[in-house]
Amino acid sequence: MKLSYFYVAADVPDGIIPESSVVIDVLRATTTIAWALENGADSVQVFADVDELKNQAKTFDSKEKILVGERGGKKLDGFDLGNSPLGVSPESVKGKRVFMSTTNGTRSLHRVRESKSLYTMALPNRKAIAERLKSDNPKEVWIVGSGWEGSYSLEDSLAAGALASLLMDQLESVQIVNDELMASVALWKNWENDVEGCLRIASHGQRLAGIGNHDDDFACCASLDNLSVIPKQIEMGVLRSN
């Protein structure tokens, strides 16, 4: 199994459809996706464009949908929830389609939407995704970070390194293909005993801290291997627990 890591959507090669892709946005889109599905959401549909999201959402009854979105870490006007994993409680999302648009994560999902198998991962469901990849046994896996407005993010690279490290520990056949992932594994080894500390010193972590008290979000996003949910794309742009 060959593993590659791309810091942001723009780094993903053109003209190639990977066998398997894993998209990461630790703070906070893929953590929110994992918790929404864990808490009983029927599905999560992701959009890079807010107007497209609103048009699609109009086709659903109000009782069958919930709108989740943020820009710059703040809830979008007219949306039900911002991009917090704590907001997608069972009372809010159970049985509903979550229509979601965020600053960074939804762009990366859009970029690799044609992958043969597409998953989303956060630190809470790292082990579950690793187990699924072991079961699928693809020849090649692209791990795609989300970054911040097109630039590198520490926390996504930490999670990429966490996934690769776990797979390397469990499979002799794993090959790390690029330096980006090798550096991410080293980053994980350095911070694996203080995951929340890494999230807090990251520039996006500092950005979140600067716009309000996000202590509970940090704790949730830093939790490791406590969810068994596996968000998988079942149709273009639509994720469901698989």
UniProtKB/Swiss-Prot annotation:
The keyword Hydrolase applies. Its cofactor is Mg(2+). SUPFAM superfamilies: ComB-like (SSF142823). The keyword Magnesium applies. InterPro entries: ComB-like, ComB-like_sf. Keywords: Hydrolase, Magnesium. Its EC number is 3.1.3.71. Transmembrane segments: none annotated. Pfam families: 2-ph_phosp. GO terms for molecular function: 2-phosphosulfolactate phosphatase activity; magnesium ion binding; sulfopyruvate decarboxylase activity. It catalyses: (2R)-O-phospho-3-sulfolactate + H2O = (2R)-3-sulfolactate + phosphate. Belongs to the ComB family. This is Probable 2-phosphosulfolactate phosphatase. It comes from Prochlorococcus marinus (strain NATL2A).
